Amino acid sequence: MADSNELKNPNKYFVLFIVSLGTVLSGYVASSLDIALSNIMNTFGFTMDNVTWVLLAYMIPYGATLPIMGKLGDQFGRKKMYVLGLIVFTAATMMVGLSWSSSTVILFRMFQGMGAAMFFPNAMTLVSDAFPPNERGQALGMWGAFAAAGAVLGPTIGGYIVEYLNWRMLFNSIVPIAAVGIVLSIMVLKESDTISSKKIDYLGGLFLVSSLSSLIIALNKGSKEGWTSLYIVGLFICTVLSLLAFLYVESRTAEPLVDLELFRNGTFTAANIVGFLTFMALNGGLFLIPFFLRNILGYTPIRAGVSLFPLIGSMIILAPLGGKLADKAGGKIPTVLGMTILSIALYSFHTMTDQTAYLPIALRLILMGIGLALTMSPLSTAAMATLPKEKAGVGSGVFNLFKNVGGSVGIAILGTLLDQRQIFHTQILSDYVNASSDAAQHFLSSIQAGLILNGMQTNEAYVVALSTLKGIVAKQAAVMAYGDVFQATAALAALGIIAGMLIKDVKKPVPQEPVVSDAEEVVPVGIH
């Protein structure tokens, strides 16, 4: 079967390249925005609230519409949705670079998120269409590694562009590459043969978007507004009520947007839980590590971005191995093994200090990359293998939704935890090391004496010495807080191990397959 499939799909690696191109570009643009934000602020006089909405403008349409876009791919064709999404994303990216006000930046960022949501879930099925069943895991592993590569290239290449050119070039520079990707997609990609019912559940979609939008805003605004503020509590209430309304509509409509029967599938449900926990830990970790490198170790933004290369390098090299293991042994074993390695890697970060050299950090990042490489594609295989092909698009949309929400929850909760633990450790250390303690007096006297020898007045020298002591306390409190939160990310990954044990591998069917085109044999899997 593999041989015949290969004969029918001679362009399978070209398809993988084309789909990976769009995925890399979206990850690159999304991650490089952090580098450009301060420059955008200066150009348009952004307030911090404007900056938050620049981020949310992408996250809300992307996260809230993933299942809808997957469903539309099932209904109207996955190639159509992929190409249309890439066109929308490219045009919006170009317009962000040409923006003339803060409002237009936010508006075009919304279209960016919408375009990414259109092509991402459908990209998975296009890769699956191009490869025979015994190679799909490996192919999706490679695709997933390139998806992660885009996220790491943003802070590095994007950092150089922002520093030596300008922030507008960050967005406009990808347009020619994306245009080539659009043309190649139209010429090479094949449309999916299976198109489901054209009926669209608009009411269910409305409630789903309302629920997820409220949740994303609440998670990202909660720390600033206060988790118990009327605004945030109201958003959480809206989230719950909209979700209940969505479940009610979906359980009673003949053509639901998300077939709730999917969650009767224990393996699909378990894989979604693992995906949620994995991205909660992963996004939390990737949020913390660059901040640790910059704020604690004093790395420049570009150096901090380049420092993540061992992570992406190990992922790219080993992702095909994770896919091969999934093809041969099923998704459960490599998923559990990968989550175990990921948990160990995240836990090892808690021992870092302000004196940690780069080599030990690089080794930790490599271990983290190995864990992710073994987890991602096998987990996607496990999530999607038992779903009927006509529900593959919406299934991959739901799977990506769980990962996306998990990532948002992880950043919000772990970011808040970091602030709380830093306050806690600052208080403890300040009580222990105060101006009246013997240790503090000895330190202050030493610093003060050195400053006086250099010609500083006694009172001024004391103020500088005291400020230095407070800075040391604050830095050590921050190091300890980072350590606590890294342990929390490891615990989340460990919970993923438990959920992974609930996955049941599906035995591959033997020659009961009808003699149809390979595109009809798709068992799509995916990774974000």
Regions found by a protein language model. Give the residues of each.
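Cytoplasmic loop-to-transmembrane helix junctions
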Residues: 50, 135-142, 391-398
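Symmetry-related core transmembrane helices of the 12-TM Major Facilitator Superfamily/SLC fold
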Residues: 171-186, 235-239, 484-501
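Helix-loop-helix hairpins in multi-pass membrane proteins, especially solute transporters
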Residues: 66-204, 230-231
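Hydrophobic transmembrane architecture of multi-pass small-molecule transporters
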Residues: 405-505, 510-528
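Helix-loop junctions on the cytosolic side of multi-pass membrane transporters
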Residues: 183-202, 248-257, 424, 502-511
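Transmembrane core module of solute transporters
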Residues: 12-66, 104, 146, 165-166, ...
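Small-residue-rich alpha-helical segments with characteristic i,i+4
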Residues: 153, 159, 361-445, 488
